[in-house]
């Protein structure tokens, strides 16, 4: 059974829509980038920490961890700490292309073909999507932050929500911007014989 090491309703919706069966086991791993860490490395490390935390509790299951980071002008944006932080992030993103990076980690066991012995594997990857956001007026930012929608999202916006009106185009995987690169996850599951 695939265990999603995340309480994110968006990740759950994406897996459900793709027809991938799973159970949810949320983690309390702090999502803190390390100083000087490359954004992809940070997203991959945090995804690994989440998956490893649950894998220790459920060693016979396949565990999927993920972490999403937004990068603009070299600054990594995680989830906003408060409404003021959300407004600050939206001002940074306003009128600028930025990258959404999701690190994904799959931990489990698979049989070796020659002797059917089980071995543990860790498959860690990341996906990057470029998002183009229109320029936002202060009134747009304040009214959007007041809805509460930005508060639990990396970069303080939801492409699948009200912020979609400010995003004319993206380059890359849409589901990655929502929070989980589904095609990448499916390829990883298939590689390890666990796609069904």
Question: Whereabouts are the PLM-identified features?
Answer:
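A short beta-strand-loop structural module common to alpha/beta enzyme folds
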Residues: 23-31
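N-terminal beta1-alpha1 ligand-phosphate binding loop
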Residues: 1-20
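Cofactor-binding loop segments of dinucleotide-utilizing enzymes, especially the Rossmann-like FAD-
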Residues: 7, 27, 109
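Flexible, glycine-rich phosphate/dinucleotide-binding loops
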Residues: 11, 31-33, 113
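N-terminal functional modules and adjacent low-complexity/disordered segments of proteins
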Residues: 9, 24, 113-116
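Short loop/helix-cap segments at secondary-structure boundaries that form the rim of catalytic
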Residues: 13-17, 34, 56-57
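Anionic-ligand binding patches
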Residues: 2-3, 36-196
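A structural micro-motif
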Residues: 20-22, 61
